[in-house]
């Protein structure tokens, strides 16, 4: 891969910020930035050569560049980093919290990064995640009780009647007067001279109805009214369902 050329820097001096120690025999090109964060230090030993436009930053640790080290133009070094003696760092390379051994040649455009330090930095910058998980953990001790399913209870069998249907049937039976009682009441209400007409014989058969009709409660006093109409008007043979 062909790297773009390093642009010239208009500044004739390099920039220094923080605790930076530079040996008098070191050579630093214009436009170089040396920046050390609080409680951090940058040490450049004898014979070190830093190319045009490179940036060296000490963050969360010290940066130490040992003697006779060559850093090509356009490099980025973020500490803590230790570069061994007589090592060579190619142009436009990036070093992030990764040490370089002595007499090592790094090709141009390389990326050297300490993944363990990167993970620790990310974990330290997000403490709210641990607090959220700690707050959520007590809720798991008291889980929510499951809602019972309506299909767990089996429906009653078709042949059995519910208690409400049995109560309705018993009330209907008690409210029905018998045929003999209805005849006695009618005969007592007539005078002695009147002849009592004979009531036709009525044969009742159990109607074949569906289960839905049987479940309906009968009308109170319906049988009594039918017997009374048969007695008063035998010629019409009135039947009422």
Curated annotation (Swiss-Prot):
GO cellular-component term (any): carboxysome
Superkingdom in the source lineage: Bacteria
Gene Ontology BP term (one): photosynthesis
Positions of short motif Encapsulation peptide: 219-241
GO molecular function annotation: structural constituent of carboxysome shell
Entry keyword annotation includes Cell inner membrane: no
Biased composition (Low complexity): 196-206
Gene3D superfamilies: Hexapeptide repeat proteins (2.160.10.10)
Sequence similarity: Belongs to the CcmN family.
Biological function: Required for carboxysome formation; the N-terminus interacts with CcmM which itself binds RuBisCO (ribulose bisphosphate carboxylase, rbcL-rbcS). May also contact shell protein CcmK to help assemble the carboxysome.
Protein name: Carboxysome assembly protein CcmN
Designated gene of the protein: ccmN
